[in-house]
Amino acid sequence: MIESTIISQLEEASAVLSNFIEQEKKQNSIAKAADVITSSLKQGGKIISCGNGGSSCDAMHFAEELTGRYRENRKAIPAISISDPSHMSCVANDYGYKFVFSRYLEALGNKGDVLLAISTSGNSENVLEAVKEAKNKGMFVVALTGKDGGKLLPLADVCINVPHVGYADRIQEVHIKIIHTLILLIEQSLL
């Protein structure tokens, strides 16, 4: 019983990744996203990332791999995850959770920066508000989504969508591979 569960889970994860790879061969969205991000960084911009739950962890992981290190030693790359508990609780209490990311961008987002918006459904209200604010500020938007891309799909400059309609964990597993690939491409472009 345990062995069959383990094998079925790994096979399902492999199938979701394989399906995404076939789509990516046609769309080339990861390369487009890396190009948008590196162009911004080369012009003095920064990357601000956001998401909810596991996607928040992915947003933090992305930022720390850039400000810290991924595989090799290199200069720090400007990236911030919107995850400060004081900011989040203040804005959620005073304005509503819908605005926790957009208020941060209102304060710290600049024209030419990049917002990495992560939502497995593509419909997270606070992420959509962040995208609206990013667009108002003249920022570029790269989105990581799942399912059909949701409302986020048409709003992003580049949307990397994992077309899986099952549980979000499978989408998140592919998102972390995408994040690591983006970081590798960013490093290769900047070094």
Swiss-Prot record:
Protein name in the entry: Phosphoheptose isomerase
InterPro entries: GmhA/DiaA, Phosphoheptose_Isoase, SIS_dom, SIS_dom_sf, SIS_GmhA/DiaA_subfam
Gene name as annotated: gmhA
PROSITE patterns: SIS
Database matches in HAMAP family: GmhA
Signal peptide range: none
Co-factor: note: Binds 1 zinc ion per subunit.
GO biological process, one term: carbohydrate metabolic process
Pfam families: SIS_2
Domain SIS: 37-191
Source organism of the structure: Cytophaga hutchinsonii (strain ATCC 33406 / DSM 1761 / CIP 103989 / NBRC 15051 / NCIMB 9469 / D465)
